[in-house]
Amino acid sequence: MPGKLRVHELAKQLGVTSKELLATLKDQGEFVKTASSTIEPPVVKKMKKHYESLGVTTEAPAASQEPKAKKPAAPKPAAPKPAATPQQAAKPAAPKPAAPKPAAEKKPAPKPAAKPVPKPGFSAAKAESSAPKPAAPKPAAPKPAAQSSTTATPGSMPRPQAKPAPKPGGRAPRVANNPFSSGPRPAPRPGGGNRSGNAPRPGGGPRPGGNRPQGGQGGPAERAPRPGGRGGQPRPQGGSRSQQSGGQERQGGGRRPSPAMMPTHPNPGQMPSRSNGSRNGRGGAGGQGGRPGFGGGRPGGGGSAGGRGGRRGGTAGAFGRPGGAPRKGRKSKRQKRNEYEAMQAPNVIGGVRLPDGGGATIRLARGASLSDFAEKINADAAALVQALFNLGEMVTATASVNEETLQLLGEEMNYKVEVVSPEDEDRELLESFDLQFGEDEGTEEDLAKRPPVVTVMGHVDHGKTRLLDTIRKTNVGSDEAGGITQGIGAYQVTVNIDDLSRKITFLDTPGHEAFTAMRARGAKSTDIAVLVVAADDGVMPQTVEAINHAKAADVPIVVAVNKIDKPGASPDKIRGQLTEYGLVPEEYGGDTMFVDISAKQNINIDGLLEAVLLTADASLDLRANPDMDAQGVAIEAHLDRGRGPVATVIVQRGTLRVGDSVVAGDAYGRVRRMVDEYGNDVEEAGPSRPVQMQGLNGVPGAGDNLLVVEDDRVARQIANQRNARKRNALAAKTRKRVSLEDLDSVLKETSTLNLILKGDNAGSVEALEDALLKIEVDDEVQLNIIDRGVGAVTQTNVSLAAASDAVIIAFNVRAEGKATEEANAEGVDIRYYTVIYRALEEVEQALKGMLKPIYEEREIGRAEIRAIFKASAVGLIAGCMVESGKVRRNASIRLLRDGTVVADNAKIESLRREKDDATEVAAGYECGMVLSYPDIQVGDIIEVFEQVEVPRT
């Protein structure tokens, strides 16, 4: 079975770069890290279809045929056929020392030398097979000049070729520069030298083909050779080395190269050029018959005349610095002026040059980092970090940044930054998987009627819970006898109107906080809102808040005036009060239905249900497609000890079946079991049907969307991306902005209260966290929620609390197993609560207790100095009369003289009444005091005060 394709392999087949394919995969919602990551076959098929739609054809067949096309260009067995032994090669080399003289006088000889090299299939084997054709006594003919350089006697070949001839049009092979290499020596290039017979030039005269057609250093015909025997002079050791290497004799020249002369790495001047003219005349005095370690055509003794191009001076090859990169020089005035103008550009912040957006709009997700911003604008993340630092913000490249900071940085670069809302972010995520939430599929004929979904809201103690209990007891089946599953947050009741059986789905939400969270996520989970108002209490603040929530969600309202049986109840007063908030009763000419009920006495409950159905029929189009994949909302979720994560969901459209792959918020899984409000197993649930679902890998949040997807892989990818985005948004929200101005205050010691929240369901944990974060305290203390979860307190929670010095808040849950023992051993404080308001009060008191105390000054007494006595042991003694209050020993005093403060915060070191020491002296008595401030006079007033701690509020 073939293995999975990797990203770079698929990119090669599609004919795109790996970077482009990685970007496309990320846009399509596929999580791949690098180009070596494997891809699932469905994703491969998806990518091929995507690129075929863009007009890109795959290149898989061409890639498979590419190795076969290279084989004819490498005829390896062709080299050994004309090869000769070194003994045979040395014999015909001797009688041709003066062959190049007539050829050297012909200057047009280099021109035809450029023709034979680019021919396809031209190799050293063909050159050797044609060796007998050009005769040695006829070197003056210009016609075979190109062949004479390559068709010399067989002795001109150093040894049989080990490498194939270069491909036509391809780059010439790299020439080795290690003279001590023991490996096979490279064969000389065809057409590498233009001297007939590869014989050395006597006296270093001008050589044919030595001048490059591309300029550079001229040959000896243009200037005299350099002193020292390097300018094309033959080596004296050339004759002795010809027998060993199979090349021609060297006549004179420079000294033998040593390892000290070798460069540590190949230079650009040693690299073979692409043009044929640059290949001609590569050899110096040694020519092709030079030392095999230097390669064919490498300059022997010198070769500076044609060995390299570029600047004058220096030697080529392995003996000096070739004409490579230019030396670093001074900047021109134009370069300096351009750099100065670039530094003065408007998009340069603190010396950091940033791109100019030109007013373009950049969309970023919540909690985006500077790396994400830099990727959007093709900039360097380090430059953004430095620019933000110059603006006074200390942020790393990968840290989540809040919306204000991103917009500030965008304004500096002339970009308009838009942070995507949670709704748009989730919609774009689903669109990347070709999914949509909130719309019915199919035509009008596919839509069917569904029951209305009703949420009951109202002020505390107005009878909302009693109304729900009354409705449930009224519609419980006779076989159940009131045995309703109280933990479920939604249920259906049946109402008979005009001999028709109608169903209504009620949501038992834990208050308006959860209702707000659901509306904020854009889930149309509620069709009608029932507003419960007590007739004897009137409109309260939470009643007004519930009205505002319902209006913001564009939900019709039915008002239930409760407790009409109590004395002092005034339903008409309630109608008048609600008129101020836009709820005008129908009897007053409005469109809001008011129903007077008594939930305790079960009065007119059926009338309320009938009003709900009439409002639904008149104001709403309650239809859905039951045949599509199910979509809904998670009303509540909790962690059960035996069943695992259990979510109470309500299906809005489609049909949810056992075995479907679902994703709810950042949780995903496969539906293993569904039960209704009576605890009965359900195989499928249609629109507006509430069920309890098992099979998720985690506990979703209250109000999270439920979606049926194609398979578990898609569900996992959607959940992981949602989880990552939630973490980034939370990190950006909780990160405290540190600027250079408040750096000193940040570095000061601050008190932080770390909390770990555990609750019985996701809704209570969410409500508790939101309420705790809204507690307003001084900046000296901070509240940090380091972890939150659903279920009992575990040992993991205790270990985390012990490591981070945190307090565990357990809401309607207890510690399980050995968690209590470990908490006692580690000294971890676990607080248990059943009422959310009690938890909020105690946490607020704990935060206030962590505040630094505030002291205020309170005056205790007042005394006047009447006389001054001198004592050698203690100094001056003030004889005083206490005018008001009390004077205490060791108390703080303030000395006044003529209404001016002379000494502040002095101390009473000694206090005596008559001759006895006294702790305090009351008003109307005389006393003697020794003060810490010695400069006292008669008539001075002494104010005695103390610092009293004031409780923080």
Swiss-Prot record:
Residues 483-487 are annotated as: G2. It holds the Pfam family GTP_EFTU. Transmembrane segments: none annotated. The keyword Nucleotide-binding applies. Residues 562-565 are annotated as: G4. GO terms for molecular function: GTP binding; GTPase activity; translation initiation factor activity. Residues 55-340 are annotated as: Disordered. CDD domains: IF2_eIF5B (cd01887), IF2_mtIF2_II (cd03702), mtIF2_IVc (cd03692). It comes from the Bacteria. Its main location: cytoplasm. Residues 598-600 are annotated as: G5. InterPro entries: EF-G-like_DII, EFTu-like_2, IF2_II, IF2_N, P-loop_NTPase, Small_GTP-bd, T_Tr_GTP-bd_dom, TF_IF2_bacterial-like. One of its GO terms (cellular component) is cytosol. Residues 327-336 have a biased composition (Basic residues). The keyword Protein biosynthesis applies. Residues 508-511 are annotated as: G3. Belongs to the TRAFAC class translation factor GTPase superfamily. Classic translation factor GTPase family. IF-2 subfamily. This is Translation initiation factor IF-2. It comes from Corynebacterium diphtheriae (strain ATCC 700971 / NCTC 13129 / Biotype gravis). The gene is infB.
